[in-house]
Amino acid sequence: VAYNPALIDEEAPLKSAGLSADLIDSVELENLANIYLWRYPDLNITILRPCNIVGPGVRNSISTLLGMERAPVLAGFSPMMQFIHIDDMADAIVLAYNKPQRGIFNVAPQDWVAYQHALKLCGCGRIPVPSIPPILPRMILRTLNLRSFPSYLMHFFKYPVVIDGRAFAREFGFTPRRPLKEIFRFYRENKKPV
């Protein structure tokens, strides 16, 4: 993760080293779909790689963090991140379904924000967690029982992962309708205690 290009395009391989079994499975599923994509050109296979999906009803780590009153941050790190509203992602899926176009496509808006600034815009206080030595943040998070900041995503909260969604936007005529301001307002108005 630390060596990602500034904008990750569809040619970049997915990385699963050191991640959870679920994320490793996701990478393997995409690899299998990719094999079929090239082995069987008659099949119409469209693979969508979204950025962080957030919004009402979304129950993933990043959505949980944005919804907290106080969220942990790794001291000295605030990577750039992208967010797409769940309704915009649903629109992207419908577009991909309605237009048979084979290939791999990143789905992301053309804006991004630093993680700690996103927390601030969502009305979250920040709990700084020391990032070195590497075992220390894991011990602190385990002690505080902060499941929303899982240790296997530690690198994700250190280094930027910004994907290039221009190919999908161009091919499918996709433009997200919900700006970051609207996404963050939802989290600011719907806080959950730690």
Locate each region found by the language model.
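Short aromatic-enriched loop/helix-cap "lid" or pocket-rim segments at secondary-structure transitions
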Residues: 2-6, 57-62, 117-120
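Alpha-helical membrane-targeting segments
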Residues: 60-83, 125-161
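Substrate-positioning beta->alpha
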Residues: 25-29, 58-62, 74-97, 102-103
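Conserved SDR Rossmann-fold cofactor-binding beta-strand/turn motif
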Residues: 49-50, 54
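N-terminal Rossmann-like NAD(P)+-binding domain of SDR-like oxidoreductases, especially those catalyzing
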Residues: 1-18
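Active-site Tyr-X1-5-Lys
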Residues: 2, 18-46
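Mid/C-terminal beta-alpha module of Rossmann-like enzyme folds, strongest
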Residues: 90-152, 165, 181, 185-188, ...
